[in-house]
């Protein structure tokens, strides 16, 4: 899966550590483009040892890959919202600098991959800290902001978001897939959520553009 194949918001159910490492290497090793990975995690899941075996950090050709990886621990939606604002600032400043032709602008196109794992943990922690209503507001605002940022791409900078969820949290998706009953109509995407939907199913129905398997 390459950057160009990603939708604005993509769900990736239970990727293996090997597939995740291959994805990172494939996208961050390209020439003539700066691809940065922002790995936002609530569960300390970045497969560092596997990645170092696949991409030895001591080799000169791999230095650039490691320089373009940012790993952040994020425990609630307030922290995720703050990170989203920082990414928006990065994209905006790069766009402004490119228009002005300043030395601060990235000379090669900037592509940002925002990889979020543990969103259900962040959501649950936010519910404990504030309220269910506030948590839903933060989730909605963050996801909508990511969509706006993705749509506002240009030749100098763009962003794509990947959300990792356990497969077992997407039982409704797999049931509908097996029965060939899912509809993509706008009306069905906007229908009221059934009681018992997991966070992953909620995001799949209302915010995600695709699900990668």
Swiss-Prot record:
<dbReference type="GO" id="GO:0000725">
    <property type="term" value="P:recombinational repair"/>
</dbReference>
<dbReference type="GO" id="GO:0045132">
    <property type="term" value="P:meiotic chromosome segregation"/>
</dbReference>
<dbReference type="GO" id="GO:0042275">
    <property type="term" value="P:error-free postreplication DNA repair"/>
</dbReference>
<comment type="subunit">
    <text>Component of the SHU complex composed of at least CSM2, PSY3, SHU1 and SHU2.</text>
</comment>
<protein>
    <recommendedName>
        <fullName>Chromosome segregation in meiosis protein 2</fullName>
    </recommendedName>
</protein>
<dbReference type="GO" id="GO:0043007">
    <property type="term" value="P:maintenance of rDNA"/>
</dbReference>
<dbReference type="GO" id="GO:1903112">
    <property type="term" value="P:positive regulation of single-strand break repair via homologous recombination"/>
</dbReference>
<keyword id="KW-0539">Nucleus</keyword>
<keyword id="KW-0227">DNA damage</keyword>
<dbReference type="GO" id="GO:0005737">
    <property type="term" value="C:cytoplasm"/>
</dbReference>
<dbReference type="GO" id="GO:0035861">
    <property type="term" value="C:site of double-strand break"/>
</dbReference>
<comment type="similarity">
    <text>Belongs to the CSM2 family.</text>
</comment>
<dbReference type="Pfam" id="PF16834">
    <property type="entry name" value="CSM2"/>
</dbReference>
<comment type="function">
    <text>Involved in chromosome segregation during meiosis. Promotes efficient recombinational repair and functions in the protection of the genome from spontaneous and induced DNA damage like mutations and gross chromosomal rearrangements (GCRs).</text>
</comment>
<dbReference type="InterPro" id="IPR031783">
    <property type="entry name" value="Csm2"/>
</dbReference>
<dbReference type="GO" id="GO:0000730">
    <property type="term" value="P:DNA recombinase assembly"/>
</dbReference>
<dbReference type="GO" id="GO:0097196">
    <property type="term" value="C:Shu complex"/>
</dbReference>
<keyword id="KW-0963">Cytoplasm</keyword>
<keyword id="KW-0234">DNA repair</keyword>
<dbReference type="GO" id="GO:0005634">
    <property type="term" value="C:nucleus"/>
</dbReference>
<keyword id="KW-0469">Meiosis</keyword>
<dbReference type="InterPro" id="IPR027417">
    <property type="entry name" value="P-loop_NTPase"/>
</dbReference>
């Amino acid at each position: 899966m390459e950057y160009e194949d990603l939708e604005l918001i993509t769900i990736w159910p239970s990727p293996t550590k090997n597939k995740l490492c291959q994805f990172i290497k494939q996208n961050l090793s390209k020439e003539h483009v700066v691809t940065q990975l922002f790995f936002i995690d609530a569960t300390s899941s970045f497969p560092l040892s596997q990645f170092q075996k696949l991409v030895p950090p001591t080799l000169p050709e791999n230095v650039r890959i490691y320089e373009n990886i940012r790993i952040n621990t994020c425990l609630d939606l307030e922290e995720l919202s703050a990170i989203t604002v920082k990414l928006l600032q990065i994209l905006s400043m790069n766009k402004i600098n490119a228009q002005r032709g300043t030395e601060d602008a990235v000379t090669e196109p900037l592509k940002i991959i925002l990889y979020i794992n543990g969103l259900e943990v962040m959501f649950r922690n936010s519910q404990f800290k504030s309220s269910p209503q506030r948590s839903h507001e933060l989730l909605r605002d963050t996801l909508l902001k990511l969509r706006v940022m993705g749509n506002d791409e240009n030749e100098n900078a763009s962003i794509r978001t990947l959300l990792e969820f356990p497969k077992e949290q997407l039982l409704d998706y797999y049931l509908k897939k097996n029965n060939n009953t899912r509809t993509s109509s706008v009306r069905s995407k906007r229908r009221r959520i059934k009681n018992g939907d997991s966070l992953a199913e909620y995001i799949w129905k209302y915010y995600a553009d695709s699900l990668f398997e």
